[in-house]
């Protein structure tokens, strides 16, 4: 027969879960801002290339933005799993990273909601 868990062991599990949520939230917040800023840089590159018609505009901005957005997707999915977002909300937050500045606005409201929900 197993011994009942001590009160300290019962409270250790939620503390670990909250720390994992805090870590996932920090990664999401950093990547939401980074993705938003690189998306603005990508818009700048598109304007320079197709509107201003500058010879040899920077092409590396699109590559960097693609990798930054991929990292944003991974970290957002990590957070979504930890806080148990429904599929529709997860898709909405993921797609918010494709519109300039919307990802940053969504990050603000999601952070506020998660901090209130988990007492961070």
Curated annotation (Swiss-Prot):
UniProt-listed Pfam families: DUF3817 (PF12823)
Membrane topology: Multi-pass membrane protein
N-acetylthreonine: residues bearing it: 2
Subcellular location: Cell membrane
GO cellular component: plasma membrane
Primary localization class, coarse: membrane
Coiled-coil regions listed: none
Superkingdom: Bacteria
Keyword Transcription regulation set for record: no
Keywords from the named record: Acetylation, Cell membrane, Membrane, Transmembrane, Transmembrane helix
TM helices/strands, residue ranges: 24-44, 61-81, 86-106
Record family assignment: To M.leprae ML1176.
Protein name: Uncharacterized protein Rv1342c
Organism: Mycobacterium tuberculosis (strain ATCC 25618 / H37Rv)
Lineage: Bacteria, Bacillati, Actinomycetota, Actinomycetes, Mycobacteriales
């Amino acid at each position: 027969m197993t011994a009942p868990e001590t009160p300290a062991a019962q409270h250790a599990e939620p503390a670990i879960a909250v720390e994992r949520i805090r870590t996932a939230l920090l990664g999401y917040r950093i990547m939401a801002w980074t993705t938003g800023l690189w998306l603005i840089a990508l818009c700048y590159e598109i304007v320079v290339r197709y509107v201003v018609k500058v010879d040899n505009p920077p092409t590396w901005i699109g590559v960097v933005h693609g990798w930054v957005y991929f990292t944003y997707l991974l970290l957002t999915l990590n957070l979504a799993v930890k806080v148990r977002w429904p599929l529709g909300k997860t898709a909405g937050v993921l797609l918010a990273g494709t519109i300039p500045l919307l990802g940053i606005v969504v990050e603000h409201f999601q952070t506020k909601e998660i901090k209130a929900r988990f007492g961070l």
